[in-house]
Amino acid sequence: MHPSESIWGTKSKSLAGKKIILGVTGSIAAVESLELARELIRHGAQVRAVMTPESLKIITQHTMEFATGQPVITNIGGQVEHVSLLGDFPDRADLLLIAPCTANTISKIAAGIDDTPVTTMATTAVGSGVPIMIAPAMHISMYRHPIVQKNIKTLTEYGIEFIDPYIEGKKAKLASVEEITERVIRRLGPRDFLGKRILIIGGSSAEPIDDMRIITNRGTGETAVQIALAAFERSADVELWMGRSSVTIPEFIRTKRFETLADLLEMVGEIDQDIVLVPAALSDYTVEKTEGKIPSDKEELVLHLRRAPKVLESIRKKKCVLFGFKAESSVTADELVARARSRMIEFELDGIVANDLREVSKGTTKVTIMTKKGTICTVAGSKKEVAHRILDEVLRYIT
């Protein structure tokens, strides 16, 4: 067994059954191609690498053969690899991904020049209608060249999708492996949320006691991030509003931050999305803030808490499909369902996701999902798997 087989599908099966041709060109970012290939495999893809002569000066074909477990194409020969892999045949590849892609290769593809294995693959893919994604990487002066920008626009008009580089100093750096992978999943996925605008509100709010101390809830923000990623993968227009959190938020997910409940309530007026999900750990109580810092040598400190307004009430005034979340602790399954249903009725929610905190551990969870239409189901698994199941129920509700 080749080592690449041991990592297949270990993160998800989102790309299971998908064949991806990975074009590698002569950018120093070619060193990232090994990890990119393996990340695609971890999500279930079969990857075949195609390399230009210039890329072979940076990494070897043996490197990419190890990464993919497949023979690497460095020349087009009697097997007419460009036709057999990307021609007009039923078993052709599902995607040509060129990452990294140089200014030279971008311009050649735009001009219909195919004098390298990668550009020949691109010419064939364009002619046969195979999707193409390009992730540029180069010096910023090259990326800003008006002819390069014109060629990018031309290729975009042909339906080729560009994964924008990160601009850092004088470099247009290759997008992260995570972003490229997520965008590939989005392109090849079910696209069942295409045209839908989804807002996810996550993390925890924090109410200031003084200039130093706060009252907050426990919450990592992981569930919100996983739902945002799942919606992104399914072609939704996603926005994430995040309070305090301890997880990394992907840079390619459009994000706004809030601190206090008052901050969030002020933002509610901006909501114009079709669907809103609120897996946030929001404060139930607020406290009147003391200016400065309360002395730490006091033997006793009394705080007067007052009930906080419910954000769901404000959001409900918007014309959107609204799913709330309800966390309980140490309750029976029947009690969990009863309390969740009561919350759903109280705030006129379209659906609610409930869980017992005892069922939550790092990376995994168990939830019960119910909707106003009377559907109810309980699902368990990784937070990524559960995020997709939540979206399945949202889709079932709106269709």
PLM features: residue spans?
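A cross-family phosphate/adenosyl-ligand binding-site feature
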Residues: M1-T399
